[in-house]
């Protein structure tokens, strides 16, 4: 989209080079070479530095846009008769710190996520440094059969977070990664700290907003999960996967957020089909 390209181009290359050099200086890499990643990301410029680190560079314009999107999301939540639960951050480094904390919180719960290394300010830019998963695929790059097999794990991750009174807050296909177990350090859900079999694949969450998981935020997460899965596996199969981790009574509140979620440009699903599948399950 033109606006996204403008935002990505708005951080001069020289400033990105300086960030890459700082990352290598801090972590002892062999080269400050970097590559911009093509990602559906409005709120940072994502880089891969030295083929070792995933770095998100956040500028003032990203913070401003985050404020606009946050206001819109909270307005949308209120239009669904719910309290707004998205938090705005006033500076790039606040956004960076929040993402680092959210990623740490997920891993502490046994939810697979790239290892968080640091968040810092560099010349007014917010910088987040995470481990890089070189062989990852996003959820929408998988086959329907692969998505169907991984759907219970996705809801298992959400259930762990919700059980600890946390929510993801921005669950969509590009924020769900699948990579060989050998790429990361967490392994399967429930076995943090163990490296898995490289012939197997693990589902990772990224970019969690880590909103406080009041009931409405949990319902919103579930609505986003169903919106992400149903185009690939069908509404009934997506709901069935959710029911492996959640009671049917938890899905009814999610149905109230489907119209709101459908307005997001990063979700494209049949709202009526998902709502009907939830009603059948109930």
Which residues fall in each region the model found?
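ATP-binding glycine-rich loop module of kinase domains
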Residues: 42-95
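Conserved kinase catalytic-core helix
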Residues: 96-97, 102-113, 136-174
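Short beta-strand micro-motifs within the conserved protein kinase catalytic domain, predominantly
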Residues: 115-125
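Catalytic activation segment of kinase domains across protein kinase-like and atypical kinase folds
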Residues: 122, 131-132, 137, 167-224, ...
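C-lobe/activation-segment region of protein kinase-like
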Residues: 200, 204-281
